[in-house]
């Protein structure tokens, strides 16, 4: 997903840190291999290159995230759209962006013509999605949060009672720290944002069974 991760945890039993690190990395590698737009051989990029009319087989993580993404797209009437990749790139963001800046009107028209979550045909029963032709998926707005969720499930499965998990600015905290307090994170503006505006007033958020997305 073109980013980093970190985990802080509390456990009554001693864990093998190297084994735990490797297990977390391996689980996230599975997510990355399916949904990272930063890897040309990832499943999502192979779907984006598929020919019009092709049915593309989905592995479990990809299917779950895409299903949720399409549900949110429908519920938000397209305010959330996992097919926005051409527009994201046109404005200079994402893994395949060129120079950041205002795109030419003709480029925006061309990009918009390839955007539309409703063009996708998802066959959940057979774990596949149909490429309508030229549609490019980008699940960056949801895949990192999913990565946090799968790490949390892994830690709980290993008996870890409390943890703060962060993947590229998406955080989830559960349980309490050794001193009995909740996990706390500081949210503040980046230096670039502060230079351009008044910025965001710093806030401390307590996370106990709660998540927060701070990126982008």
Locations of regions flagged by a protein language model:
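Mature catalytic core of soluble alpha/beta enzymes
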Residues: 1-216
């Amino acid at each position: 997903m073109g980013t980093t991760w970190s985990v802080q945890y509390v456990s009554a039993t001693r864990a093998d840190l190297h084994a735990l690190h490797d297990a977390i990395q391996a689980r996230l590698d599975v997510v990355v291999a399916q949904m990272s737009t930063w890897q040309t051989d990832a499943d999502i990029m192979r779907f984006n290159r598929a020919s019009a009319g092709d049915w593309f087989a989905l592995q479990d993580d990809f299917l779950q995230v895409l299903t949720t993404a399409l549900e949110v797209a429908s519920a938000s009437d397209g305010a959330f759209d996992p097919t926005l990749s051409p527009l994201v790139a046109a404005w200079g963001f994402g893994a395949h962006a060129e120079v950041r800046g205002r795109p030419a009107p003709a480029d925006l028209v061309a990009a918009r013509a390839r955007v539309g979550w409703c063009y996708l045909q998802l066959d959940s029963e057979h774990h596949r999605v149909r490429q309508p032709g030229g549609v490019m998926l980008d699940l960056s707005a949801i895949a990192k949060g999913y990565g946090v969720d799968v790490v949390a499930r892994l830690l709980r499965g290993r008996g870890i009672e409390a943890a703060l998990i962060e993947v590229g600015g998406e955080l989830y905290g559960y349980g309490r720290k050794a001193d009995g307090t909740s996990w706390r994170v500081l949210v503040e503006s980046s230096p670039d944002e502060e230079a351009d505006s008044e910025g965001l007033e710093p806030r401390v958020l307590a996370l106990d069974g709660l998540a927060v997305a701070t990126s982008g």
